[in-house]
Every structure is written in structure tokens, then in C-alpha cells.
């Protein structure tokens, strides 16, 4: 039976043509990890956009309250939780490549929806969509990279996923800084103040915030929001936040275009009994004489897939927990994920300017 299987695999390797033009793994990884870059950008961009969103509608802002501020961050996290849970099932059913194509569309829809939102209530559902794409990408990109890359470079390729997430956050902060500088920071032009506190003129957001108790003034946050609402405002730089949020449509479009040229995961094809498609995809990304022979790689995949297919979901978990080294890997991975979240890193990513202000560090 084993010999027959190997003969069938050899025959498929000899007779099957590549699924398309040769693709270097570096190019495949660069395209796929645009999903990771979008993950980082979309989680980091909101921190720089919030100061402009605080401004009144007349200044181009959304007149955010403290509750709105928390909900904007929370809706993305809510969507990401669902995306993380469902994204893996989607990629198992439809394929890693196909899933990334869908997520690229969701990234574009979410970015355009949030950037064009006329009110915070319209923004919320699009933040959930964006969060879903973020969560599903985090569950799909590493799997696609690990299943597509050869053994000799698998560690480096998968590590690129984490690098691109952090690079996406850095890109978000850099874009925010550039757009904020181009607009001169958050400001508004007051034409009239019924309370008489302000004379007509242009005021920076920092100047106005000095009136609140958290900045040494006399107004509570609620009173300050009511004060802003009653001002007559003719213009302002609040619209800058829309540019910050819409920028991520560019890598999302690049992801959609690029993934159309990339091969599907060979392991996904094999898990669906598609041997020739498996070989065709491997031929597209393997270098003959450098990587492991395709016959050996497919044989190993078939054997592993056969062993896994004979076990129920509960039995597969039992195999993982019975083995000391796999159990240790699982527990260490869970521990690192929990520690990473309990550091409060997400708070800084979403609300960096607010955290710095409350720390009495003015930026």
C-alpha cells in the first residue's frame, strides 16, 4: 500500500505542470504579510486619529465623548475576536489564498467606511468589519506562510509575519505624525462663544484642553464636551483623521492584487484530496536541487494527513497533551500570549496620546 502510494505520488510529480510561473518565497511572503502590515496599521492608526476626532463637527471632527472614545477601540477588538475564531474555519473551508483575498476586500470596505463615516455611530459597524479582517488575518497569514515555505527557511518566513505587524504599527504612527504636522495639529476656528470664555479666533486642541480639570482647568469632561458643542465653529483641521484612516486602503488593494498571482497552500489542497493541485503548487515555489525533493515532501504530507484524518478532534488534542514536548510548546505559547496582553500594550496602541497626556507628558 505504501509502495503504491509512492508510485502514485511519483507519477503525479512527473506529469503535473506547475500551477503558474515560478514564485520566489521572498515574493510570496512579502505579498502575504501585507495582511500582517494591515493588522499593525489598523490597530495603531486610531491613536493618532483620536485627537482630531475630538473636535466639533464644524471643525471636521466627530465631537467624541469619553464613551465614544472607548467604544471606537472596543469595536475593533470585538470584531478581531470574531475574526480570530472564524478566520481559521474560513481558511480551512475555502483555502488560505482565497481567504486572504476576501480579507483584502474587507480591509478596503472597513477603511473606506470608517474614513467616510459622517458620525461615530456610522463608524462603529465599519470598525467591527475592520476588526474582523484584523483577527482573521492574524489566523490566516502565519498558516499560509508556514504551509507554503520550505523547511530550510520556514522559521525566517514565519518570523516576517511578526515583523510586519510591528512595522505596520510604526507606519501608522509615522503617517499620523506626517499628516498631523501637515495640518498643524488639531485646531478649530471659533467665530462665536455664547459663554464669553473665548474670543473669535483659531485655537489649538491643547489650548482648549487646558480648560479641563485633568489639565488644571475648572471644567469636567462632561462640561467641556457641552462647552464645545455650543461653540460656533467655522473651520478646523479635524478632517485630518480621515486621511489617516484611508491610507491603509493602499496596502489592502496591493494584497488583493498580489494574492491573485500567488499559489494556494499545497497542504490545504492535500487536506481536500487534491494531489495534483498539491504538486502543482509546490512546483511553483520550490527550487530544484536546493529544497527537499517534492516527492519526499508530498509523501511526508500524505502520511501526516492520513494519521490526522484517522483521529477525532478530541483524540488529536489527546495526542498533543500526551507528548511532553508538544504540551510544553502549547503551554509556553499560551503563557506568552497572556503575558503579552496583560502588559497593557493594546491600551498604548489605541490611546497613546491620551496615556501621555494623563502622564503629564505633552506632545
Which residues does each predicted region cover?
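Short, small-residue-biased leader/transition segments that mark boundaries at the very start
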Residues: 2-9, 363
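Transmembrane-helix signature of 12-pass secondary carriers
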Residues: 10-361
